[in-house]
Amino acid sequence: MTERKGMEEINREEFQEVVVNVGRVTKVVKGGRRFRFNALVVVGNKNGLVGFGLGKAKEVPDAIKKAVDDAFKNLIHVTIKGTTIAHDIEHKYNASRILLKPASEGTGVIAGGSTRPIVELAGIKDILTKSLGSNNPYNVVHATFDALAKIKA
C-alpha cells in the first residue's frame, strides 16, 4: 500500500515496525474491571525515514494497528552523515532528557530502552546515546524524535 507524504510516495512494505511498549489501562465499573490497551510503535525504512505512533483499543492487535497508522502520519527525515549523525544534540521532552553523540565507524548503536529501535530503524549504525531523567517510554521516544529532527547537516 502506498501513501503520499509531502511530494514523495511512501511504500509501506519497505518499512519495518517495532512495538516499543504495550500498556494496560483498567477502568473499574459496577460489573468488574474493563481493560483497554495502548501501544507505542516505531516504524522506519533504515534509510532516514522514521516515525512513531500511539494507538489505543480494547484489544492489543487493534491498538498496534492504530499505532502503526499513526506512525505513518508522523514520519520525519533524519539527516545521516556516513553511518552516524552530524553533531551532538541534547533534547528535553517533559521530564525526559536524551543525549545523542556521533560515534566513529565500527562503534555500533549504544542505546538503551526506547531509544535503540528508533536509531536502528532510522538507519544510524554508529551512535552513542544517554537517556536522563524520566524513562517513561512515550516521553523518551518523543524526546529522541525531536532531537533527531533538529539535526542539521
Swiss-Prot record:
Keywords: Ribonucleoprotein, Ribosomal protein, RNA-binding, rRNA-binding. InterPro entries: Ribosomal_Su5_D2-typ_SF, Ribosomal_uS5, Ribosomal_uS5_bac-type, Ribosomal_uS5_C, Ribosomal_uS5_N, Ribosomal_uS5_N_CS, Ribsml_uS5_D2-typ_fold_subgr. GO terms for molecular function: rRNA binding; structural constituent of ribosome. GO terms for cellular component: small ribosomal subunit. Residues 15-78 form the S5 DRBM domain. It holds the Pfam family Ribosomal_S5. Part of the 30S ribosomal subunit. Contacts proteins S4 and S8. With S4 and S12 plays an important role in translational accuracy. The N-terminal domain interacts with the head of the 30S subunit; the C-terminal domain interacts with the body and contacts protein S4. The interaction surface between S4 and S5 is involved in control of translational fidelity. This is Small ribosomal subunit protein uS5. It comes from Helicobacter acinonychis (strain Sheeba).
